Amino acid sequence: MTLQTFQSADFAVFSVDGLERRMNAIKTHIQPKLETLGERFSHYLSDQTGEPFFYHVAKHARRKVNPPNDTWVAFSTNKRGYKMLPHFQIGLWGTHAFIYFGLIYECPQKEVAAHALLEHLNDLKTNIPNDFVWSIDHTKPDVLPHNTLEAKDLQKIIERLATVKKAELLVGIHIAPEEFSSMTNEQFQTKIESTIHSLLPLYNICNR
């Protein structure tokens, strides 16, 4: 299946009221694209890392009342899940799409990974592109732009990952809905590949 960019109708899904109606809209408009992204980039990540990667499309199965405000496909080296490992995500909120590498609170190795990242603090500050953003909570759309952080700020959020049980850390890019109006499918694929290329050093640090 051909990889397709996200369109305005995909972002509008998150304005649909009600759990059942919004989930039906997600399944109709977004999940087929996430499946295609999953197929494409699980192979890409396997090729880039030499490890088998598997993709996991968010099903939101535990939701009983409140509809999801975002959705995604995640990539990890575990066929059964991704939350317990450093992983990659591609997804969207109503306000933006995102491409991330991260560790969320269910990951038991996040303390060890945080200490490894701290050893490379100056490299992270220098080498991560200025248009990247950091998230400390995957359930919220708020982020910290990399170009606004000093090394001490970066150190603080990485140390928090190690010391706070519920702490998380994700890094990557946001793409505004209007950017997709002039983005071809091929350009979207290239954007994802270049973002993953910039994030792979962090993956390698966290898995050494």
UniProtKB/Swiss-Prot annotation:
- Name-wise, this protein is UPF0637 protein Bcer98_2662
UniProt record similarity statement: Belongs to the UPF0637 family.
Q: Which SUPFAM superfamilies match?
A: YktB/PF0168-like (SSF142913)
Any one Pfam family here would be: DUF1054
